[in-house]
Amino acid sequence: MSSFPTAFSRAPSLMFTMQNLSNINSTNVRLGRLNNQLATGLDILRPSDDPVRSAAISTLDTRIEHTNQLLQNLNFAGSSVGTLDQILADAKNLVDEAASIASSQINSDPETRESQALIIDSLIDSLYSLSNQESLIGHVFGGSAPGRQPIIYDRGAYRFVGEVGGLTAALGTASNVPLTLGVGSAIGELSSRMEGTVNLDPDLTADTLLTDLNGANRLGVNTGIIEFSYNGGQVAQVDLTGAVTVGDVLDRLNAAVIEYESDQAVTVLGPSAFSVNNGSISVDIPAGNLEFFDIAGSSVASDLGLTNNAAVPFNAGNPDGIDLDPKLTWTSPITSLAGLGGTPLGSIQLNNNAATHTIDLSGAQTLADIKSAIEAGNTGVRVLISDDQQSINIVTESAGLQTHALSISEVLGGGDTAALLGIRTLAGSTRLSDFNDGDGVSIIEGRTDPLTGLVDPALNTDFEIKLGDGFTISIDLSTADIATVDTFVAAVNAQADAQLTAAGRPTTDFSANMGAISNGIEFNQSAALGAGGPIGIRPVNNSQAAEQLGLMDGKSGGANTLLRSEDRATIRVNNLFSHLLDLSEALKNDDTFGIELATKRLGISQDHVIQARSTVGGYSRRLDDEVRRQEDRVVFDQAVRSQLRDLDFAAASSEFAQLQLQLQAGLSVAAQSQQRTLLDFLG
């Protein structure tokens, strides 16, 4: 409260006036600030009011803003996942209806089957519509590219052009929850079997990135400082920090050793200096020994294959370091692929989605050129680098009938290019378990004579081969015989040779082999036998082996000297679309076995859809949990911020009343102290 300054017994009136004004102004300032606080509800109006509390409030503001953004993201994510769940529920109902129809038609008549096929076709149309539905984020089956329609209809097949993986967003601890589904969702799927069978084994080049090396220790390659010496002399250092390519490493090593030669007055390097040889760094040393060392705690020289063989340093007899195992990349030059053995590439034939493409790879300079050539022209396939980055894989995008399946074969005069690249779909190394969309080949084995209890070869024969003159060769296959195409061909040739020899016939009458150009297993008979008639195949003991090997649907050629099997190693997309198409086709063709097979595969699709929906349900639960967690966090942060920032209205109201009283008292005292009396006019 303003008061008369008792410290001054005698003072000028101006001093009293200024003192009173100062006290009144101070009270007014405090009233003004408190008035602003009451109007805004804030205790801190500017950072300078309390820097410590202001810093804490600023941090809380940022956290609350971030959390609110997360809650918005979670809201969109929940909507997308909810749409996914509903679509998968509809797909489950659809596949249940299809499975019910399939089961009811196993013992039905042709007319009913044909009418039910129309219903299956309508279910396929419904599935096509479901697969292209959108949520707030985009197409739910588009994978990491939801802006593009994931399933397109292409020449009778349903082609998945979506991406691998799902779209993710900042969702707190649920950030790894995909908001869309891509490959592996039971609806969007690619084929998975065509894995390259040849290790292309790229050589080291100057342009090879250090990040594309597995390194001598198979742990990658680090950069840093390494040491070296010549003939046990002075040790010098070379800094490889910042090197990006193998060429960078070679240049720095060359420069360091040349400087070493000048400083030590010695000759270390030959004309080729540092270079690459196959997968290793190579050093041209006419004489003497060059050794490299790692400094303590480092593995740079070891990673580069310069020290792993310390017992034998670099010299004229040991110019190469340890192989650095370069990875296969799209920029790998064709000339660097040791797996090709230096053989030039030619052409391949690719059949997919009921279309045939002859692809010329002779002009390819890099692996990316091969990828572009194979994927161009609407072939409906994707070329991928294998997980171990040593070979290439090819997958088809089109889910259709068997006639739409993928096969890759050679072209006459094409130089066995498909086999060179390891992408021929039917080769000697192809597993018979991969035949018939993965159903494999079944044989009769282990049947015994009911009287003797011994295994009877006659009861285990799978099929007979009838030559042009009527001579019959019995083929009894074992489990070992049906491992690969090569083991099957070897078993047939061995049994045929034995039976021909026992009958006093030349073994040249018959032979089996893998087709050199076209995909198929070939049975050959001599021209003389071909004049008598074509090669015939007859299943025995109800064995399905001949049918599953494609021999029953084989084609004759070469004036009846050749029987080439149907290609049963084609590659298909096994998803709900292909299974429904198979069922529709089987119903239209009155194919009981096909209906049974489609029913079995629909059961697999049911499991996939159920599993996908369960997974999406788990995602939804995680999103709900994260929403609750973030909401709790916002409430807590807002409570803490309120304690730091907001005004205590009760205390502020009391203080406001006190300041009003103080102002009133100050004004009163000032008025009284400034009153004039008679004494003011006495001289």
Where in this protein do the model-derived segments appear?
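Structured core elements
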Residues: T168-A170, N176-P178, S282, R382-L384, ...
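Threonine/glycine-rich low-complexity segments that form extended coil/beta-edge repetitive scaffolds
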Residues: A89, D96, L167, T173-D251, ...
